[in-house]
C-alpha cells in the first residue's frame, strides 16, 4: 500500500495541541485593520480550536500528526 500524503496547505494552517486538539488562527487579521478596534485586533490574534464538524476532514488530510 502506498504512503499517505500530507496536505501541505492544511499542515501550514493547523497545529495539534498536546491534548490532541486541532488549533487554528482566526480570520480577518491580514489587512483592513485600521477600522478595527484594538480590542478586536487583540482577540483576532489568539488561536482557537477547530469546530467538531471539521475535525474529521482535517485529520484525514494530516495522517501523520
UniProtKB/Swiss-Prot annotation:
Its main location: plastid. GO terms for molecular function: structural constituent of ribosome. InterPro entries: Ribosomal_bL35, Ribosomal_bL35-like, Ribosomal_bL35_CS, Ribosomal_bL35_sf. One of its GO terms (cellular component) is large ribosomal subunit. Pfam families: Ribosomal_L35p (PF01632). It comes from the Eukaryota. It is found in: Plastid, Chloroplast. Keywords: Chloroplast, Plastid, Ribonucleoprotein, Ribosomal protein. Residues 25-45 are annotated as: Disordered. Residues 25-44 have a biased composition (Basic residues). GO terms for biological process: translation. Belongs to the bacterial ribosomal protein bL35 family. This is Large ribosomal subunit protein bL35c. It comes from Pyropia yezoensis (Susabi-nori).
Amino acid at each position: 500500500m502506498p504512503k499517505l500524503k500530507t496536505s501541505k496547505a492544511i499542515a501550514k494552517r493547523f497545529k495539534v495541541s498536546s491534548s490532541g486538539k486541532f488549533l487554528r488562527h482566526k480570520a480577518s487579521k491580514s489587512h483592513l485593520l485600521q477600522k478595527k478596534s484594538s480590542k478586536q485586533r487583540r482577540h483576532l490574534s489568539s488561536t482557537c480550536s477547530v469546530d467538531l464538524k471539521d475535525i474529521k476532514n482535517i485529520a484525514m488530510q494530516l495522517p501523520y500528526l
